[in-house]
């Protein structure tokens, strides 16, 4: 199992628009060309760091020495460690929660398996540590810590790495989204049709993949990276660019933390490969591939969940559902997620306009309204997948609940869109964007 040995060292950076070639340096897998003139607000970008650590990046190098492992340290974590060693007090010290907040958070965790779990409230109660707190609880409640003999301190350190490698300034692709997907995955792992077949390894893989599936997301989509000639797009040959990066980053953190170092090498290699297969399945461009295969299995009634391959396939489907389940939440939460993802689209559109690039589909705030985007997303992406998931679960209580929320939320967006058109005197179709437009915009499709 190879791993891209990288040093993540800064967020989205754009070259001067006067240059003939415009490119983007995304947080992750990036080599800076200079040490001076780095804007102070860029996360983890400090000129005193020795940028030679970023050199000699390879696509398939094995990690065999401590020196190589050190390259996997993210720039942000490297900076935090180095300034602490120099005796500099962090600018944002840890604020401890009072007992009232901790008590409320613990009470919420007692209901973590319910579909109306409010991840936004939970994130506030945990002072922005929803992902770490949730995963520590789930690893314990599923018996994974005992089964895999995981060290609690090492587990916590790894989870903090994952949480910190999400960009808090992203409206949508941030650690709260990862926590929301993880909570949904937990609910799906409890579905009776699936739960009785799952092994501890399946459960751990599902939770880890859900938590890390968008780690280090730059807040722009794959087409943006391709048209700006970003080096990650070249590295992964324009195929599942972000998903490959999320996977490689996850493996880097697993190895750096040594969370699984006590397990047999063959087992850790298998875990890394399966995590890759799960995370890569979230590529929206593969939606039809997975949907067609799921329909065929259900039609032929040939799913054998005692078979590891079939079980892994259903874990992929479960993760895909968890990743795009926002429209199936209650309206108050679903609406908030919709506004967040569209805000992220619009920010990308603003960047494209600023640098005289063609504005990507769904990213033009003047033309692409939130109701229109969401109606198309629900119609062409969410509904087909969740209908098949309901067939698989035998129309379980949770599946019926999700489809009910989906229908209600779609009606709400149609009503809002109709009101918008009445105000504008437009007779535009209420169907939303075409499916090919949605698939072109990875992430609209959150």
From Swiss-Prot:
Binding site for a divalent metal cation 2: 214
Pfam family membership, one: PDEase_I
Keyword rRNA-binding annotated: no
Pathway named in the protein's UniProt entry: Purine metabolism; 3',5'-cyclic AMP degradation; AMP from 3',5'-cyclic AMP: step 1/1
Free-text comment on the cofactor: Binds 2 divalent metal cations per subunit. Site 1 may preferentially bind zinc ions, while site 2 has a preference for magnesium and/or manganese ions.
Keyword Metal-binding included in the entry's annotation: yes
EC number: 3.1.4.53
Protein family per UniProt: Belongs to the cyclic nucleotide phosphodiesterase family. PDE7 subfamily.
Modification type Phosphoserine: residues: 426
Gene3D superfamilies assigned: 3'5'-cyclic nucleotide phosphodiesterase, catalytic domain
Annotated region described as Disordered, given as residue ranges: 422-446
Record comment regarding domains: Composed of a C-terminal catalytic domain containing two putative divalent metal sites and an N-terminal regulatory domain.
InterPro entries tied to this protein: HD/PDEase_dom (IPR003607), PDEase (IPR023088), PDEase_catalytic_dom (IPR002073), PDEase_catalytic_dom_sf (IPR036971), PDEase_CS (IPR023174)
Entry-linked SMART domains: HDc
Catalysed reactions, semicolon-separated: 3',5'-cyclic AMP + H2O = AMP + H(+)
One example GO MF annotation: metal ion binding
Expression (tissue specificity): Highly expressed in brain.
Signal peptide annotation: none
Needed cofactors: a divalent metal cation
Name of protein: 3',5'-cyclic-AMP phosphodiesterase 7B
One of the GO BP terms on file: signal transduction
Transmembrane segments: none
Enzyme class: hydrolase
Mechanisms controlling activity: Inhibited by dipyridamole, IBMX and SCH 51866. Insensitive to zaprinast, rolipram, and milrinone.
Function, as annotated: Hydrolyzes the second messenger cAMP, which is a key regulator of many important physiological processes. May be involved in the control of cAMP-mediated neural activity and cAMP metabolism in the brain.
Keywords on record: cAMP, Hydrolase, Metal-binding, Phosphoprotein
């Amino acid at each position: 199992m190879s791993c891209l040995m990288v040093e993540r060292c800064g967020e989205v950076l754009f070259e001067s628009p006067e240059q003939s070639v415009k490119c983007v340096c995304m947080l992750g897998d990036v080599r800076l060309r200079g040490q001076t003139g780095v804007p102070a607000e860029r996360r983890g970008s400090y000129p005193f760091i020795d940028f030679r650590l970023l050199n000699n990046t390879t696509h398939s190098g094995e990690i065999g020495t401590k020196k190589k492992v050190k390259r996997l340290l993210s720039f942000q974590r490297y900076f935090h460690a180095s300034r602490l060693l120099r005796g500099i007090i962090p600018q944002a010290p840890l604020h401890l929660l009072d007992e009232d907040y901790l008590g409320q958070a613990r009470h919420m965790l007692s209901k973590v398996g319910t579909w109306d779990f409010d991840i936004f409230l939970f994130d506030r109660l945990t002072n922005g540590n929803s992902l770490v707190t949730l995963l520590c609880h789930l690893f314990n409640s599923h018996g994974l810590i005992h089964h895999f003999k995981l060290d609690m301190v090492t587990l916590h350190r790894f989870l903090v790495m994952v949480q910190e490698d999400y960009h808090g300034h992203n409206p949508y692709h941030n650690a709260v989204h990862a926590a929301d997907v993880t909570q949904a995955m937990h609910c799906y792992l409890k579905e009776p049709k699936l739960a009785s077949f799952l092994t501890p390894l399946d459960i751990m893989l599902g939770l880890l993949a859900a938590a890390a599936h968008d780690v280090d997301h730059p807040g722009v989509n794959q087409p943006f990276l391709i048209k700006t000639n970003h080096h990650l797009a070249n590295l992964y040959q324009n195929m599942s660019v972000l998903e490959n990066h999320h996977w490689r980053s996850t493996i880097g953190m697993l190895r750096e933390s040594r969370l699984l170092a006590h397990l047999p090498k063959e087992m850790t290699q298998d875990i890394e490969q399966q995590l890759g297969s799960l995370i890569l399945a979230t590529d929206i461009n593969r939606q039809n591939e997975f949907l067609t295969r799921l329909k065929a299995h259900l039609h032929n009634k040939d799913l054998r969940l005692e078979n590891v391959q079939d079980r892994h396939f259903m874990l992929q489907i479960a993760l895909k559902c968890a990743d795009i389940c926002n429209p199936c939440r209650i309206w108050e939460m679903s609406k908030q997620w919709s506004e967040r993802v569209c805000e992220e689209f619009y920010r990308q559109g603003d960047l494209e306009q600023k640098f005289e690039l063609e504005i990507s589909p769904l990213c033009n705030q003047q033309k692409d309204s939130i109701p229109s985007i969401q109606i198309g997303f629900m119609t062409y992406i969410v509904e087909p997948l969740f209908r098949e998931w309901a067939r698989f679960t035998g129309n379980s209580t949770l599946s019926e609940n999700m489809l009910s929320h989906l229908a209600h939320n779609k009606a709400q967006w149609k009503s809002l869109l109709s009101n918008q058109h009445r105000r504008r005197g437009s007779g535009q179709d209420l169907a939303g964007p075409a499916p090919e437009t949605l698939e072109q915009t990875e992430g609209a499709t959150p």
